[in-house]
Amino acid sequence: SFEVKRGTTLAIVGPNGAGKTMLFRTLLNLAPYSGKIEWAGRVKIGYVPQRLSVSDIPISVKEFLSFKSTSNIGDCLSSVGLDSDEMLNKSLGVLSGGQLQRVLIAWAIIDNPNVLLFDEPTTGVDLDSEEAIYKMLSELKEKSEITILLISHDIHIVRDYSDYMLSINKCKTFFGESKAIMDPDLQRIIYGEAVCMA
């Protein structure tokens, strides 16, 4: 079991097939489960799945965001580090990987959720853009006291931008502060002797 405090970031890490995405599906009531999920107060969830194929859709950034909300589009783009004047009329198909991920994050937060779920939020972006996106999410959390849960394979980056980690590997599950979970001895218990900590 684990508990996530309001206004903190939980990174969920582990190998493919460990159950990370299934955990998100459970939190979204999209999969059956046993046990109990308790939310403190009213919860409104914003969600960006691991693969959301929107780049082939022939619509602009403005049109895409308008499917969810027509208010505060410019402010929402600014909050994820994008220039609204430059981006609004651009087609989704011409955006870089980093720009598209930021637009998807804007889509997730445009209706003011208090919990954000990101399944691999930096898929398909280069290392510099990856770190910039995590930094942006950290700043967003600080400004709005939003609670963020994110799935990532890159524990070396998310350790710097998360308050807590849930490390999953088959039957082994460990939850705690990120620095504690990153302890090399614990990582070897979770992932085996082949793990390399840098």
Task: Specify the residue positions occupied by each region the protein language model found.
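Hydrophobic anchor residue at the start of the ABC signature
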Residues: 105
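H-loop (His-switch) and adjacent beta-strand-loop-beta switch element
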Residues: 165-178
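Conserved ABC ATPase signature
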Residues: 91-95, 99
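The feature captures the beta-strand-to-loop junction immediately N-terminal to the Walker
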Residues: 13-15
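Short loop immediately C-terminal to the Walker-B catalytic DE motif
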Residues: 122-123
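H-loop/switch region of ABC-family ATPase nucleotide-binding domains
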Residues: 152-153
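Catalytic Walker B motif of ABC-type/P-loop ATPase nucleotide-binding domains
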Residues: 116-119
